[in-house]
């Protein structure tokens, strides 16, 4: 699977969805990981770190979204990103859909498969939601790495 890590463009959001170690694990499982140039800068992860982990650095967000079957983000897409989302593409991020009808409508219109971090549970019997880190690690590692 082709996995994309675009740079976050929402105001005051400096995190990145995947560390170099995460990229290494995904690549080791047979996936291709495309990281937008500078995506990790706000989290002190260099492009070189991603390359050493097996990722491919792309120059633009458009390239990352275009080449990727799965997009890993931290925050919900904003208006400037809606046009990049395509039918059948998987978007895994915090969505907070109750707060944005516009985002909800854009996701529906795109035909993508949107998975919200805040709704992922580690234990199906548990009513407790996972932390940001747990939800990403669990779903990405469990689902993607098993598809090797």
Q: What residue ranges belong to the model's regions?
A:
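Structural/interface elements that position substrates and couple domains in central-metabolism enzymes
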Residues: 1-127, 131
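Positively charged, low-complexity/disordered segments
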Residues: 132-148
